[in-house]
């Protein structure tokens, strides 16, 4: 679907988009002894009121990947697959200029995407110490570009992994 002249994806993302880098803890309660796994995750998200879901569908069509979900009064477009993020989302925003604050956030996030893509399929315990420390630093540095920065969860555990790698 060709992009309409009246939709500016970079402007929408500059206002309502999120380049998310997080360290996650996942516990598998259904498995014996409920093992816990830690991992770095990136995602690209744009949210809007439910009435604007068509705009998010158009963004999905233009970018060429991701999913649009509608829950309650909110629509959410997200790309979570690392291959789609590295191969499609990052190149798209290198070609389409974001507002200054969002551009700085994107550049940090894109560095994180490279590190995670490079280590795809590897256990976190086998990552190089430098890569883990780089992601921790990127996460800390990007907080100043967030509208509502959150305290990162499990960061101490991520730092512990950097000491064993």
How should these model regions be labeled?
Residues 1-165:
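Sequence-level preference for short, compositionally simple segments enriched
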